[in-house]
Amino acid sequence: MAQQSLFYSFIARGTVILVEFTDFKGNFTSVAAQYLENLPSSNNKFTYNCDGHTFNDLVENGFTYCVVAVDSAGREIPMAFLERVKEDFYKRYGGEKAATDQANSLNKEFGSNLKEHMQYCMDHPDEISNLAKAKAQVSEVKSLMMENIEKVLARGVICEMLGSSESQPQAFYIKRTQMKRKKWFQNMKIKLIVLAIIIALILIIILSVCGGFNCGK
């Protein structure tokens, strides 16, 4: 059994805690309620340190996914846990399903899911770390590719515009709309190709990390 590095988690809509889980006794609910009142509502990820513990949050579309961990757990494992919980929660209650639920109304339905995800992340720290590194690599590759694509597109359009203006100055303004349309189609075509490459990279990296098709769920 792995060390208990994650010990309390909740999911809230605004300041309403819909579901929470912990194996420990304490005033977690009241602390969480006060904590939510001061948490930024914008979509983002936050980590706050307090007395050797971290409050790790993922805020998205009005929902807050939070896990309290020991400081030594770092940031990768808590954030990986939150991503897993968010995906699971959205599959079950996405859209309007969780928009009107009352406080703690999902404890019975989803509390055990929080426990399972928590235990999985604590039991598989190496896998979590490898996946985090893989995602970082994919994000870096995507960022570089998109940056280069934008530069190539911009250069091509500028050259074409200059060529048009030199050979036919009177048609320069007329062709602006055509060139914008052409640039949009070029942009979409290349982005679709990049998306396919990125998906292939993600699959290759995940398969290499998990050892083929034997990834644990």
Curated annotation (Swiss-Prot):
- What Pfam families does this protein's entry cite? Longin, Synaptobrevin
Q: Which GO CC annotations does the UniProt entry carry?
A: endoplasmic reticulum; endoplasmic reticulum membrane
Record protein name field: Vesicle-associated membrane protein 723
Question: Where would I find the Longin domain in this sequence?
Answer: 10-114
Known function: Involved in the targeting and/or fusion of transport vesicles to their target membrane.
Give the tissue specificity.
Highly expressed in stems and roots. Detected in flowers and leaves.
Q: Identify the coding gene.
A: VAMP723
The residues exposed to the Cytoplasmic compartment are 1-192
Q: Which InterPro entries does the entry link to?
A: Longin-like_dom_sf (IPR011012), Longin_dom (IPR010908), Synaptobrevin-like (IPR001388), Synaptobrevin-like_transport (IPR051097), V_SNARE_CC (IPR042855)
Signal listed as a keyword: no
Residue ranges that the UniProt entry lists as topological domain Vesicular:
214-217
Q: Name one GO biological process term.
A: protein transport
Write down the CDD domains for this protein, in alphabetical order.
Answer: Longin, R-SNARE
Q: Which family does it belong to?
A: Belongs to the synaptobrevin family.
Residue ranges of the v-SNARE coiled-coil homology domain?
A: 130-186
Q: Where are the transmembrane segments?
A: 193-213
The annotated topology with respect to the bilayer is: Single-pass type IV membrane protein
Chief subcellular location equals: endoplasmic reticulum
State the UniProt keywords alphabetically.
Answer: Coiled coil, Endoplasmic reticulum, Membrane, Protein transport, Transmembrane, Transmembrane helix, Transport
Stored PANTHER family? SNARE PROTEINS, VESICLE-ASSOCIATED MEMBRANE PROTEIN 722-RELATED
This chain's source organism reads: Arabidopsis thaliana (Mouse-ear cress)
Q: Where in the cell is it found?
A: Endoplasmic reticulum membrane
